UniProtKB/Swiss-Prot annotation:
Record: residues binding substrate: 153-155, 199, 212-213, 235
Keyword Cytoplasm: yes
Pathway assignment: Cofactor biosynthesis; pyridoxine 5'-phosphate biosynthesis; pyridoxine 5'-phosphate from D-erythrose 4-phosphate: step 1/5
Intracellular or extracellular location(s): Cytoplasm
GO cellular component: a single term: cytoplasm
Residues forming coiled coils: none
Alphabetized CDD domains for the sequence: GAPDH_C_E4PDH (cd23937), GAPDH_N_E4PDH (cd17892)
Catalysed reactions, semicolon-separated: D-erythrose 4-phosphate + NAD(+) + H2O = 4-phospho-D-erythronate + NADH + 2 H(+)
Record-given protein name: D-erythrose-4-phosphate dehydrogenase
Superkingdom assignment: Bacteria
């Protein structure tokens, strides 16, 4: 049993726990502790009831300072400082760092200093972490000695597998991406102050451009594309599921059928469970609670002058990414058991 602690029980933290129980992987991964500054009553309530993902179908109760999920007791902590977390006492194998604010190697080192064996960040980190892992792309590069790891971002997990498939099949020269992302917690319900002036505006009333470092994230995982991709992002008034508008220039000449066939082929092969492909006339809500990292909408594939390709790629930016966090924990544990690091 892998002993895991979650630091920060927000959208990703809660969905990781939900996914563990819904998929039965709680038999392999035990959530031992949750560190969340919110009151325990709120922690339990938001685990049980979720606007995007519905009611949690497993029983949840509070027992003093413990959250009891389907009979499993989870210690609740409310520590602001990583240095106050009792990871050694709790014998934690992996900390899932899901606060959204701790994204530097030093934060991972603090968790390890407290007794955790490994740390997995739920967001992009700097190049000084031991590894950034995108499932289906580079998990085989992970070593047992890698103790501070990033799972990248939901958008990196969505777009990188598609780029990789296109590059292997047709050789990608360059590209641009527009992320069409659901609203997030750092936006305002009504107009209110924020350092980013665009994010001072009501999330439900506008399409809001925001900064993104997606292009740099692609380079970190696929270094051959350094300087060859650019990206912009907008937030739209939905609460979950996002889309990626990908345009790439290929070295090969292709048709729409060529592109779609290449993507169809891998969905049942090495990217099974990571990349999916659909030609049904679906809308964003149809992908809610979809565990794939990316779903290519083949009805929207376009080709111009045989070498410029445009794709629409969907993802449940919460559920898909949370499932990839679990996948990486399992890979980390397998490596630790095999002690294959160098």
């Amino acid at each position: 049993m892998i002993r895991v602690a979650i630091n920060g029980f927000g959208r990703v933290g809660r969905n990781v726990l939900r996914a563990l129980y819904e998929t039965g992987q709680n038999k392999q991964i035990q959530i031992v502790a949750i560190n969340e500054l919110a009151e325990p009553e709120g922690v339990a309530h938001l685990l049980k009831y979720d606007t995007a993902h519905g009611r949690f179908r497993f029983p949840v109760v509070l027992d003093n300072q413990q959250l009891v999920v389907a009979g499993d007791h989870i210690t609740l902590l409310q520590q602001e400082n990583i240095r106050d977390l009792p990871w050694a006492q709790l014998d934690i194998d992996v900390v899932l760092e899901c606060t959204g604010v701790n994204n530097e190697r030093v934060h991972g080192e603090q968790h390890i200093a407290q007794g955790a064996k490994k740390v997995l960040f739920s967001q992009p980190c700097g190049p000084d972490v031991d590894a950034t892992i995108i499932m289906g792309i580079n998990e085989e590069s992970l070593k047992a000695s890698d103790s501070i790891v990033s799972a990248g971002s939901c958008t990196t997990n969505c777009i990188v597998p598609v780029i990789q498939v296109l590059d292997e099949a047709f050789s990608v020269s360059s590209g641009t991406i527009t992320t069409i992302h659901s609203s997030m917690h750092d936006q305002q319900v009504i107009d209110a102050y924020h350092p980013d002036l665009r994010r001072t505006r009501a999330a439900s009333q506008s399409i809001i451009p925001v900064d993104t470092k997606l292009a740099r994230g692609i380079e970190r995982v696929l270094p051959k594309f350094a300087g060859k991709f650019e990206a912009i992002a907008v937030r739209v008034p939905t609460i979950n599921v996002s889309a990626m508008d990908l345009s790439v220039t290929l070295d090969a000449k292709v048709t729409i059928d060529d592109v779609n066939q290449a993507l169809k082929t891998v969905k049942n092969g090495r990217l099974n469970g990571i990349l999916d492909f659909t030609e049904e006339p679906l809308v964003s809500v149809d992908f809610n609670h979809d565990a794939h990292s990316c779903i290519v909408d083949g009805t929207q594939t376009r080709v111009s002058h045989k070498q410029l390709v445009k794709l629409l790629v969907w993802c449940d930016n919460e559920w898909g990414f949370s499932n990839r966090m679990i996948d990486i924990v399992l890979v980390m544990n397998t490596l630790s058991l095999g002690n294959t690091g160098k």
